């Protein structure tokens, strides 16, 4: 009799909770090739960026009329961790689908780099609140391979929990409670249902809360039009302020580029295309341009209008990642024997959810008043009143934490 297939479950959760600031710096032209690439975690930052762009373009291909928001950091961490328990073509597909070239970087270096990157992101002394977590939920009768347990704990700081998957409601509650606690209540009931033959669950979350150095004044926020498309306009609370910004117009992208730094090591990059140029922006934007923007700051005065918004994205990663070449792990040919030798496993579900809130001050009130000098000449008005793209990156490594596209800030 052929062995039955038990199913593993992979869940991913991500949160971004923003409180705006501005930090302007003068910078000269810098060769991006001169960056210090010595730390271990820098070995994978370029791969993470490649994966972020690949996944973004796949999401645009599926729908160019919907908001997009996801955490490439969360997704790659979870699947890289899963690869530790995979073998043969299953492992090769996962790592190559995550944009790792195994002829250029040894697999051991990939996991070592994730280990150091997670340590960097979770620094307790950082002014930025950025926490990641990885949870392994194992059926109480399932025996995991000791080497797998050891490697995911050492490299990915994961926790292991014994769960009775025969009681699907209780198992679902344990998993959802873990995510809700890790994201400080921002993501609840992530897991709507469990397949009846689930015996293993892998959960990743990322929680981010950043504060702008110079918050917008809430008293200046006014309702204004946001042009979703040529025929659709919605009313949104529009923040505004006059000041000095890291901002310039990029003719290559036909877009305004705005960079806003957080207290700590993170930067938000917003790209506002000219009317009718969104597709051009999406086709032309590269990781090298992003790197150049971060290194070559251009400070100018402007009157900035920016919408308050709260968006989220929930994605079936089985569909998305299959389009990027990761297929075997989801079918009966999957080789996950590095996780358990008790029974064949395959990945039955892969869910990713990310949430973003952006407002004047964020979740913590700002008590400081900031006064800054601006040139006497009339500064330009830059209005983020139509669809735009943004990324939030960890400044030291330029690793993409979150990627998004705002089509309609009211949805």
Curated annotation (Swiss-Prot):
Plasma. The modification Phosphoserine is found at residues 33, 377. Residues 1-24 form the signal peptide. Its main location: secreted. SMART domains: SERPIN. Inhibitor of serine proteases. The primary target is elastase, but also has a moderate affinity for plasmin and thrombin. The lineage of its organism: Eukaryota, Metazoa, Chordata, Craniata, Vertebrata. Gene3D superfamilies: Alpha-1-antitrypsin, domain 1 (2.30.39.10), Antithrombin, subunit I, domain 2 (3.30.497.10), Serpins superfamily (2.10.310.10). It is found in: Secreted. This is Alpha-1-antiproteinase. One of its GO terms (molecular function) is protease binding. Glycans are attached at residues 64, 101, 265. GO terms for biological process: acute-phase response; response to chromate; response to cytokine; response to estradiol; response to hypoxia; response to lead ion; response to lipopolysaccharide; response to methanol. The reactive center loop (RCL) extends out from the body of the protein and directs binding to the target protease. The protease cleaves the serpin at the reactive site within the RCL, establishing a covalent linkage between the carboxyl group of the serpin reactive site and the serine hydroxyl of the protease. The resulting inactive serpin-protease complex is highly stable. Residues 367-386 are annotated as: RCL. Pfam families: Serpin. Belongs to the serpin family. It comes from Rattus norvegicus. Keywords: Acute phase, Glycoprotein, Phosphoprotein, Protease inhibitor, Secreted, Serine protease inhibitor, Signal.
